[in-house]
Amino acid sequence: MTTLCLNMIVKNESKIILRLFDSVVNIIDCYCICDTGSTDNTVELIKTYFENKNIPGKIVNEPFKNFCHNRNFSIRSCLGMSDYILLLDADMLLQIYNFDKNTLRNFDSFYILQGNDNFYYQNTRIVRNNGLYSYVGVTHEYLNTPSNNKTGLINKTELFILDIGDGGSKQNKFE
């Protein structure tokens, strides 16, 4: 069976993070979340939620430097935990329809449609957990893929990322 690790960077997301977890709990096998300096109870919520669901994982701490640095730190921290990594943010909701994780084996990375009812676009949100993927760019970061990467598209009838945009640290995004 193909395994999937939830991977994120978070800071002060206690008001919304459980909503995301509830949306992914049925397809993830583990989690690796990088906290960049939460001062609320985000870390405690993460631990308690996944302990109650018997989902293994870890929280790593790395002070926020920039999105590229922290996302790469987070990805490196989950190396060896799963076959694939699911890259999400706390202010998203993963809508799962007709999705079989075992189909992931056919490709190295996957576009998932992301957005809202009026506008959506393809974004690489699942990658093979092999240490070959990294982010580039300080603020408007993008995923750098290996030259021999085979990318698949997950149809909107299988998965869709609803980008709600109400993250807890939007107001102090660069602190």
Regions found by a protein language model. Give the residues of each.
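A structural alpha-helix within SAM-dependent methyltransferase catalytic domains
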Residues: 21-25, 32, 47, 75, ...
